[in-house]
Amino acid sequence: MRVVGTFASMAVLALAACSGKPADDAIVAVAQSSEPATVASYPDSSQPPAAEPAPPVAAEEVEAPSGNHVALKYLIGDIDPAKDPMFAKIPEKYLGGSRVWGHKDAVDAFVRMAEDAASNGYVLKAVSAFRSFSDQKEIWENKWNGKTAVGGKKLNVSTPDPKARALKILEFSSMPATSRHHWGTDFDINNLNNSYFNTRDGKRIYDWLTSHAPQYGFCQVYSAKGADGRPTGYEEEKWHWSYMPVASWYLKQYPIDVGYERIAGFDGATSAKDIDVIKNYVQ
């Protein structure tokens, strides 16, 4: 496997992934720039868009890690991004939440995309990015134990059956050790509700992302069920965009290195195997 650091290759990979086609096993595209990212001023989003941006320029080729192997700690979020050179901070200008870290190549691509969107009157902000195992455990257990209501209900009261309770949470939240957010490749953009993307402003953003995000390597991985032959997994998330040049690489490695013995250490973990969460929610 070789790594190709061109945005043209990224676009091919992302478009293939977004259309449901498997990526070329022989190529993993990883965009990485040695230059610091620059940020631009956001115009008023009510202004009419200017001409569409030109396709991004090519980036330099980068070396793949030894053996092209993704270490287990990256797959399950067992890292501190502030101490890991694989991660970078999202510039404050492009943040809409408190989760500031992402895989450095994904951050670079997101900044490029946000800059080009801004120049055309579209404001993109990451409201969530990397989450550690501990972060995801807190989200999951708050829902599992009724601290955070799900659909207006405390699931520890309304849904005592462990498998049924896990399935309800899995509509929109991942089990710890199974979230794509562990990889730092996935960004929640602008809002965490599908209803927002049906508003005038939200639809405008979503339409731009649908048309242009693949140019930068991003794909909406949780599209509407049934629309693209996706019978299982999470419900549609119009806000969730994945940087496929790196994420597809991690996804290929995940079922090789992560077994159900690794999906443990949180309330409700015993349901993971019964649900076959790796097959139905990760792959």
Regions inferred by a protein language model and the residue ranges of each:
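Extracytoplasmic cell-surface/polysaccharide-interacting catalytic and binding patches
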Residues: 18-283
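Sec-dependent N-terminal signal peptides
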Residues: 1-27
